[in-house]
Amino acid sequence: MVEIVEEPDDHQSSSTGAGSSGSSSAPPPPPPPAYSSISQYVSANTMECVLFAARVLTVFFALNYMIPFIGLVPAHSAYYKIFAASAATFALRLHTRIQGQFALNAQFIQRLIIEDSFHYLVYSVVFLMAAPVSMAALPVTIYAALHACTFMTKILRETGHTSSIIPKLEQFTAHQTQNALGIIACSEIFLVPLLVSLIFSGKGSLLLPFAYYRFLSLRYASRRNPSTRQAFAQMRGSLQNVAMSSSCPRPISSLIYRAIDFISARAPPVM
């Protein structure tokens, strides 16, 4: 005997489905934004916004210097404005890091020296007072661009914007930060022979390589950013591989080892 079961109509089936789906736990709603508008964020985080503006100016002047046909700022003027904006950025950042506290004692000086912001403040001032060296603009420009991208994603997230550019910026900064730090470290190292060559060509100051050596020593000893030490270690390993190669002439191999020993003997201890 076949049992006849009445099929539910469409209304009943949809209501049943809605009831079953309603009984399942729904995902929690996203948290409300911390700030209702960008202006509110700016009012609450004025220093961060000033730093962002200074970094944008650094990138702007760098583009005018590297791409002269933009024509908004003369190239020679743009070069020095790169380092002026960079010096302002790192001075403000250093002020934030030391929380506005200032003292003329050894403890404060030691605390100041280990700050990366102090290193790049010195870097910016040194090249602000020297003849133009195009490669010198690269580190501060890359740093400014990276921090500007990070700030843009932060302010858009915290003000409730859901633009598709936010995850792209976050992904870009996450994937490219290490590459950018490596480029910065290598450019800072390769500036040393370039500055020495400028002396022999009559375009550089005798004091510039010595001042720059102090900066590079500070970067090598940095605790927060080991990219300079890593770059030196990678270069040392590559040169040692070349020197140990059977195809490398003995005088060249000896010269490489002497250069490695000379540079290693002058490496400062890590702070």
UniProtKB/Swiss-Prot annotation:
Its main location: membrane. The chain crosses the membrane at residues 56-76, 125-145, 180-200. GO terms for cellular component: endoplasmic reticulum; membrane. It holds the Pfam family TMEM33_Pom33. Residues 13-25 have a biased composition (Low complexity). It is a multi-pass membrane protein. Residues 1-32 are annotated as: Disordered. Keywords: Membrane, Transmembrane, Transmembrane helix. GO terms for biological process: endoplasmic reticulum tubular network organization; membrane organization. This is Transmembrane protein 33 homolog. The gene is npp-25.
